Structure formats: structure tokens, C-alpha cells
């Protein structure tokens, strides 16, 4: 039954399946058809959009090209304006050149006249100069005779001065010799002082007091000697000053004469300067003439350059015109090519969009990855640089620290040595002073103990304070002596200053008298100048006649000016006719009318008028050309509409063909779907079998998973335990390392200090041996006692000292034995860099302390080491002690301060616990040092040995049986011997003083001899005075001769005594001779100067005469100059009147120019204010009344200007009428274009409506609303075509180039892109 039912069911199922498959296929077909239709519509819309975009781009490019054409036209117009300006500048330059030429010719004529007058004056001046030279030669001969007399007097005085100088230099030589002897004595003292300090530092301070007292006495004696010598030198200086005063009187006479000569030379220089000034004026006039000639040539050259530039500009204009024509041809070629490019552009557009999208994605990915890689590389580089910098810094700091450590150690050792040496030296030095008696009485009670450092310092302070007080007294005395010397010098300088002031007063009185004489001369000059003034007045009357001639020339010039004005009037009439015929607006020249001459202005105006008429004709041609272009564009619009209709028909045919293809594809898809259903059923059976197998595998995996979970829990517990142990051990190791390293560093430092102290002890012993040897070498007494002591010492050594050595050796051996038994060490570690510093590593306490043989001991040692290294008790103690620290570590925050304090406290507690437990484990190694206890015990063996040694040493000292003499005795012996040396030195100094007294006696005898020499010199001076005075009698002369003979006898006796000093005086004489030779040279130069001065006086007199003549000539020239200036003023007044007339005309023209500017501004404002669609150029009306009211009362020039303005107004009205007609035509064109646009827009809307109706019919049977709505959304994409741009009118191009773009129409959809908006119309 079941089989039958299954067989009946299968055909029904198959039929249902077939029906379902058919329904599905139909649905798919309908869906595919609707999708295809929607896609096609979208493509259609896209094509239309692209077409619109192409048209907009085409319009945009056209507008850009047209704007370029407009720019080129503007540039051409600018070139023409520039040419006009250059022509205007050329005319101005010609005018200025003509004026300059006339002025230069007039200046040349004036300069020639002045040159002729100056030549005549020059000849007169030359004659006067010859007369002055003759008078100057006569005065020169007289002056030479006076100079010769004066030279004889000077030679006699110089001889006297030379003798005085020789004596003064001999005394100065003696003074230098005495100073040298003093310096030698002082040097000897210093040498002796250094020798004594090197030999005996200990007794230096004691001797210093005595020596300072002696030196002060010697210094005072030397000062007295020096003062005596200074007094002698001062007496000599006074004599020399007297001689110098005489010499100064002579020099004053010379100075007066030189001052007179200088005055004459100054006067001569003034005259020369005035003469040079006149010559310079003449030269300047000549240079001005030459400069004017050069300026004239330059103006000619500049005019030629301007003409060349104008030609170049004309050539450039022609080139630009040719380039414009080429540009127009290129534009037409580009338009043809653009149509061909549009077809290719549509094909390639799709490919480029896809490739651009892919490219953009790839570029974004590439840039993102590149940025990431660069950032990573930069971060790594920064990290590397930072690390390298830190490494270098750490290496440097490490090296510097090591160097500083070594230096500090060396410095510390050196300081310790120096400190000890200083203490010893201080002790030895202070022992020899009187202050040390108190110290020794207070300190040397215990002879065995050395003196303390504080006591030594106190004694030093006392001694130093005593010496400081004495030094201050000595320094105060020296200061007072220095102050006295300075006051003496100031007094001497004041005396000299008073003398100099008196001399200057006398000179001033003399100059006053001289100036009064000059005033009298000047009054005579004034009288002569008055006579010359009368002559000048006659000349002025002559120049009045010249002025009358100039006035007649001015009248002639005014007649020529009237003729020019008549010519200008005729030209203006012709210009008016041109303007009436042309009917063109003209721009005024830019504010330079007052520089033009009438002929030049007329030429420029005529050229401008011709150019403007030509521009008007060109503008008319352009308007006709633009109308032709508008017609062509309307034809192209019609053609585009036809092409669009053709494309729509083609698209409809393509849609029908695609519908037939879609039906075929629908049938094929139904067949494929049925085959796929059968394959799905087969695969479902296979997948059921695979699922059963997988369920069995899952059960097995679950059992294995449970086992793995158990193992994992076990491993986690073990791992947590090991982690705890590891952390505890790590903390313990860290704490132990922190404790061990500083202990080890301290032990190293202690070892180095121990070595250093050992070296110091050795050096101390060596120092003691040296002191003893010194004492033995110096004291060669009690040799027999020493020999007896040596024999007793040998016996003493053999009995006691040998026994003590044996006892100490036994004690050391027992201690070493005990240490070896108690210590359980593993090994000793030695640092490689620091040799000799070792570290002992021990094991825990051995349980049984029995004695074993050697081979068993080694085995036990290995077993103990192994048990200690792998002991569980030790691990337990470490973990138990570190539990508290582990708890704190787990809870700590690195940022909080409280946690830090808790962590340090926990570490401290755990370390204390660990050390307590380790001390109980390692009981064999004593942690606390017991050395201090053993040394402190009263009945210890070490203290007993020390007491015994002390007793033996005291007994040996009593009987003199000690092997080594104590240091205190040796130092006392040294002090005694040093005291003996000082006594000997004292005796030697007493002998030295006696020798000094002998030297002073010798010097006194020399001083007496000098006094006699002074007397002889005074007699010689008196003799010289008698010679100079003419009223000396014969009896006085004989008495003076007798006195001189007596003085000569005395001098002979003195020379017998002074033969020893003759050698030193010879050197001084040699120097004096050199000085005298120099003075002789100076005297010769003075004589030559006097001669030159006399010659200069003669020249000055001659030049005075020549200057007077020149002054007369100058007054005449000045009068001529005044007359010429008056003539120039008259001419300038006439020119000013003409300039005023020109300015009146120019002002009138400027007012007209301002009015025209206002009109231009109104035009531009009306353009900007106007709307975009209804723009019309409305020119403002200019009333003739405004210009007529501004009419000026003037000559024919003003009337001609007013006539020209009226003609301009007529032309302006004609132009405004023509422009209004053109604007009306443009408005009619605009209305036509607007109607065309509205028709186009309605046609496009109709097409869109037809497309929408077709779409609604196709989608009426379908149930998918989203796809049916798609074409409705895209309706807005179909837009009307835009109109192309209208061309601009050149006359108003500059004001409307940058206007805003127009919208196409008010009904355009919002989906249009911004690029599609173009300006509708630009221009008139």
C-alpha cells in the first residue's frame, strides 16, 4: 500500500514542481525585462545629460575664446594709447630742448663777455705781483742780517747750557751707581733669606723678628742716604732751571718773531684764498657753459631715441595685428576639430571613469600604506637616535666618573700627606719661638704622647697676630712717606704752572699792541674802498643803457608770439571741421596741457582725431560681423534639434530588438533551474551521512577534553607555586645583592685606606730615621757613651725582645688554627680588575665538629656544599621571610606615594627576618665583630704584652740602654744646634753694619767735594753774566779773575780726589755730547725757519697789494652782476604774464576734463546698476550752458578753446543718439532669442512627458514599486539646451568683461550641475 501511494504521489509532485518552476521563470522574465527597460532608460538619461554637458562645455570654451579676443583688442587699444602718450612726450621734449638751446646760447654770450673782462683784470694783477716780489726780496736781505746776529747770541748761550748739563749728568751717574749698590745689597739679603729658609724652616719665625728690626734700621739709614743725594740733585736741578729760564727768554723772542711771521703768512693765505675763489668762479661759469652744451646734445640724442622707440612700437603693433588675424583663423580650425573630438570623447569617457576610480582606490591604498611605513621608520629612527645619544652620554659620564674617582683618590692621598707634613713643620717651627714656652709647659707633661693639632693651631694664631700688628705698623709708616713725596711733587708742579702763566701774560700784552697797529692799517683800507665805490657808480650808469636795449628785444619777441597765436586759431578751425565730419568721442590728454606749445598741441590733436575716426569705422565693421555670427548660431541650433529627433528614433528600434533577446534568455533560464533542483536533492542525502559520522567524532573529542582540563588545573597550581617561589627568591636575591655590593665596596675602600695608612707609617719611620741621623751628624759628642750603650743593647735585645717575639708568634699560630677549624668556607672570589681584594664564600654550620683525616675532610666539604646549595630548609626560610613583601608587591600602585612607603617598610621587615634565620643557619661565621671586645678586656694577653713593653722601654730610657733615641730628644738637640747657627749669623750681621758705617763716611766726603764743585759752577755763571753786561769796570773784572783763580786751585785739589769717578763721568759726557749735537741741529733748523719767515713777510707785503687790486676788480664784477639780475627780473615778469594766460586756458580745460570724467563714471554706474535682462546704455546729457558759464575773459586762444568745446558737444550728442538706436536693435534680438528658448523648452517637456507615459504602460503589470519610480526621478535630468554667448561691443568692453553669469530660464530643474550655467548675454 505504501508503494502504491508513493507511486501515485510522485507524478503529482512533479507536476507541482513544474508549475512552480514555470511561475518562477515567468517572474524572472518579467523582472529581467523591467530591469532591462529601466537600465535602458537610465542610459538614455545619461546620454542626454552627457550631451547637455558637452553643449555647456562647448559654450564655455566659446565664451573663453571670445574673452581672449576681447583682451587682445584691449591690448591693441592700450598700445595705441601708449603711442599717443609717447608722441606727446616727444613734443614736450622738443619744446624743452628748444628752450634749453636758447638759454645756453644766451649764457655763452654772457660768459664770453665776462672772460674778456677777467683777462684784462688778470694782466693788471700780474703787474702788481711783480712789484710785490721786488719789495719782498729787499725785506728778505734785511731779515737775514738780523738772523745772523741772533745766531751768534744763541751759540754763546748754548755753550753755557752744555757745561751745566754735563755737570748734572755726572751727578745723575753717581745717583744711579748708589742705587745699583743698594739693589745689589737687597738682592744679597734676599738670597741669604732664601738659603736660611731652605736650611732651617723650624727656626725661621724666631729669626724673622730680629731680621725685620735690623732691616728696618738699615732701610731708614738708606732712606737718609737717598734723601741727602736727592737734596744734592735738587740743588743741581735749580741751577739747571735758572739756565733754562734764560734759554726760555731767548726762545720767547724767537716765538714773537715767528708769531709775526705766522700772522703775515696767514694774511698771505687769506689773499690766496680770495684769489682762488675768484678763479673758481670763472671756472664754474665755464663749466656751466660746457654743461649746457652737453645737455643740449643729450636732449638731441634723447629725441632721436624717442623717435626710434616710436618706430619699434609701430612695428610691434603691426605684429600684434598679424597675430590677431592668425588667432581668428586658428579659432575656426579649432571649432572644426572640436566636432570631431566630441565623438571620440563620448567613447573614451566611460573607460577613463572606470580607470580613474580604480586608480584613485589604488593611490589611496598606496598613500595610506606608505604613510604608515614612513611613520614606523621615523619612529624607529627616533628611538635609535635617542638610544645612541643615551649610550654616548652614559659612556662619557662613566669615563668622567672613573677619572674623577682616580683624581679624588690621588688628591685625598696628597692632602693627607701634606696635612701631616704641615703639622710636623708647624710643630718644629713653633718649638723655636718664645710663645712655645707656655705651650711646652702645658703640653709636655706626658713625654710619650705627641702634641695635639688644636694646641699647635692656637700657638700659630698667637704668633701670626703679633706679626700682623707689626706689619700693619710698618705699612702705615710707608704710606705716610709716600704721601709726603706726592705732596712735594704737587707743589713743584704748581710752581711751574705759575711761571708758565706769567710768560703767557707777557705774550698776550704784545699781541694786543700788534692788533692795534693792524686796526690803523684797516682804517686806511676803508678810505681807499670808498674811492673805489664812486668808480662803481659810473659803471652802473653805463649798464642802464644795456637794459634799454634788452627791452627793445622783448617787444620784438611779443610780436612773434602774436603771430603764433593767429596760426593756432586757424588750426583749431580745421580741427573743428574734422570732428564734425567724423562724429567720434575723444579722450582728453592726462593733465599735461600746460607743458604744450600751441603748434605741438594741435599736431597731437589732429593725429588723435584721425585715429578715433578710424576706430569708429572698425567698430561699425565689427557690429556687422557679430550680426552675421548670430545668424550662423541660430542655423546650428536647428540642425542640433533635427539630430536629436533622429537619435530618439534609433533608440526605440534598439529597445525592440533587445525585448526579443530577453524572451529567448528567459526560456534558457527555466531549463537550467530544473536541472539545479535535481542536483540539490542528491547533495542533501550525502550531507546527512556526513553529519552522523561527525556526531560520533564529537563524543570522542568531549572525553579527551575532560582529561585535558584536569591536567591543565594541575599544571596551573604547580605554575602558581613556582611563580611565588620565583618572586620570593627574586626579591631575596635583590635585597641580598643590595646589601652585598655596598659591603664589598666598603671592604675595597678599607683595604685601599689600610695600604695608604701603611705607606704613611713607613714614611713616618723614615722621617724619624732622618731626624736621628741629622742629630747624630750635627752633635759629634758622647761617642764613647754610645759605644757602651751599643754593647748593653745587644745583651738587652738578646734577653727580653727575643722572648717577646716568640710569645707573639705562638699567639698568632693558635689564632690561625682556631680560624681554620671554625670556618666552613667554599672558595674565595678575587675581582679581576682589583688584585689583592678577595671575598670569602662560606656554607652553613656543620652539624658534627669532629676531627677527620684529610681525604675525609675534602669529601665532607663537597657534601656540605651540595647540601647547602640544595637545602629545602633554606628555601623555606627565604619564602617564609618574603611572604609579607610579596603581599605588598601584589597590592602596590606605581603612582601612589603611600604604596611606596609600605613597600620599603615591608622590604625592611622581610630582610630582617631573613637575616635572623640565616644567622641561626650560619652560626659558625661570626656576624658581629669581636675585635673591639678583645681589645677592651683588662686582663687580655695583648694588654699584658703592651704593659711589659712599656716597662722595658722606660727602664731602658733611665739607664740609656735603648736601641733607638726618642724623637723628642733628637728634636731638642737639633734646636740647640740651630740656636748656635743663629748666634753666628748675628755676629756676621754686626760686622756688616760696621762696614756700612765706613761706606757712609766715604759718601760724606764725596758730598763735600760736590759742594765745592757747585761753588765753582756758580762762579762761572757770574763770570758769564759779567761778560754779557757791558758796564763792567776793570777793577771788578780783576777781582773776579782773582776769585776764579782761587776757585781753580780748589777745583784742582777736588779733581785729585775725584779721579776714581772720572771713568763714570766720561760715559755721561758722551751722552751730553750727543744731546748737544741734537740741540745744534735744532738751532740750525730754527735759523732756517727765521730766514724763511723773513722771506714770507716780503711775499705777504706784495700779496697785500695784489689783493687790494683784486678787491677793486671784484666790486666792479658785483655791480655788473646786479645790473644783469635786474634785466633778468624784467624778462621773468614778462614771461610770467604769458604763463598766467596759459594757466587760465589750462584750468578751463581741466574743468572740462573733470566734467567728462564724471560723465564716464555715470555711464559705468548705470551699467552696474542695470539688471541683467533689461540693460540699456543711457548716456547722460551734457548741457552746453555748463560749459558756456565757465567761459573766461582772455585773448583769441580762449575763444578758440570754447569753439572746440562746442563742436565736441555736438559730436557727443550724435554718438549718444547712435548708441540708443543700437541698443534698441539689441533688445529686439534679445526678445527673439527668448522666444526661441521658450519653444525649445516646451519641446523638451513634451518629449519627457511622452517618455513617462511609455514607462507607465510597461510597468502597469509589475508589483515592484521601487523600479517603476526610477524613471520618474530621472525626468529632471532632461534639460533644455542652452543658448550660446553673444559677442561684446568693443566701445564698452572694459566695464562689462567680469559681469556675473545669467541663468538659462526660471523653469530649469535643480538637478542641473553648476557647470551648465552660462551667461545668456554680454554686451549691448
Curated annotation (Swiss-Prot):
Alphabetized InterPro entries for the sequence:
CCDC171
Keywords, ordered alphabetically: Coiled coil
- Record flagged with keyword Coiled coil: yes
Q: Give each disulfide bond as a residue pair.
A: none
Give yes or no: UniProt keyword Coiled coil.
Answer: yes
Residue stretches in coiled coil: 29-296, 325-393, 453-521, 599-712, 981-1145
Compositional bias (Polar residues) at which positions?
1301-1312
Which stretches does the entry tag as region Disordered?
1301-1324
This chain belongs to which protein, by name? Coiled-coil domain-containing protein 171
Query: What species was this sequence derived from?
Result: Mus musculus (Mouse)
